[in-house]
Amino acid sequence: MGVIGHNGGPVLQPASGWKRHCWRQARAALLPTLPVEVVRMRVARARELGLDYKTYAGVRAQTGHDVVAFLFSSNALRAMPQQPQIPPDHAARLAALQAVGRIGLAQRPLTARDLARNPELDAAHPAPAAFASFRDQAACLRAALGTLPGDRVILIAETALEREWCAAGRLAACLPAAAFFGTGVTAAENPRHSGW
């Protein structure tokens, strides 16, 4: 029997061509390969969701599920108490989303009823209160999601306080509003990670 760590990787001495070949083959065998048809379907789904493929694939790999809804904070939607109507550029972005739920979270003093008047949203609910406890945030988000599983929902957030909702709601990912509504979405944030 060998010593502890005897199979911990290649030795530090210069490897022969055969050893390099074996290690490359072993590493390549660890990476999953998807059939071209599956990749095409996932690229098409990412397009329906308005996400780049890298972001969609990352969320899909992390959760093991497809995205069924987006959760938008009223700040991310630029809906304010004086002007609850979503700006035209944001409304067009929401209208372009296909085969996915669009749920708004109204932050006080904006009411969920005012936010729900936007036809681009499928539903609107009150957002967790500012500085609410983790438990209260989780309960509020669970009420907003209804029967939707949290790990299939992506949060679009504007502020640091809103990003905390991702962990509280056990959501799939959190994307910055500027990236989602701006030039394009980059990489998704891990909901277990607090920093951006």
Functional labels for PLM-detected ranges:
Residues 1-11, 192-196:
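Extended, compositionally biased intrinsically disordered regions
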Residues 95-100, 115, 142-151:
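Flexible, charged surface loops at secondary-structure boundaries
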